[in-house]
Curated annotation (Swiss-Prot):
Official protein name in the record: Glutathione S-transferase alpha-2
GO MF terms held by the record: dinitrosyl-iron complex binding; glutathione binding; glutathione transferase activity
Gene name of the encoded protein: Gsta2
Enzyme class: transferase
Further details from the record: In addition to its enzymatic activity, the homodimer of Ya chains, called ligandin, binds various organic anions, xenobiotics, and azocarcinogen dyes.
Amino acid sequence: MSGKPVLHYFNARGRMECIRWLLAAAGVEFEEKLIQSPEDLEKLKKDGNLMFDQVPMVEIDGMKLAQTRAILNYIATKYDLYGKDMKERALIDMYSEGILDLTEMIIQLVICPPDQREAKTALAKDRTKNRYLPAFEKVLKSHGQDYLVGNRLTRVDIHLLELLLYVEEFDASLLTSFPLLKAFKSRISSLPNVKKFLQPGSQRKPAMDAKQIEEARKVFKF
């Protein structure tokens, strides 16, 4: 397929949001075909468009790519956001996995059972403050550059910014003790493509509300 990438997901962040972020940071316009009903999802499956009967799925360069990490790897490689050599890619992958682990922990809180929410929220705060943010503060200090890896923008900078914005929504006080991360957030947010994506009216999705959660439950049956 030629033209803009087409993203298939429902109208929420979920596991597609990091893909939206990376495309936007690369300056790539994309279209979205939103899944709004169980029938929409079933049609994608019956038409053979979902390799593992799961979304996210992205149509790009004649392919129908599934699996979030595979999609991110392809976009990062295509738009030169994956470092200059194997060593940089190894660091990018390592940092990205940690970022995605914490991101998943935070975004899953909105759909966890009420009787588990307090414990899982406490765990997420502890992991944020005592494991993940200290690790990335240390990376920025030791690397001494504007970016996490090398001396230019890579996918991991975008993933980290997205995470920091989630942390800020979750509990802004968690960022208080991390001056380098706060400076990083401001710096990456000021990049033209990123700044544009942060503006109202972009394809960036807001935090899920109760209505969206209920709609997602109906579509994905969780």
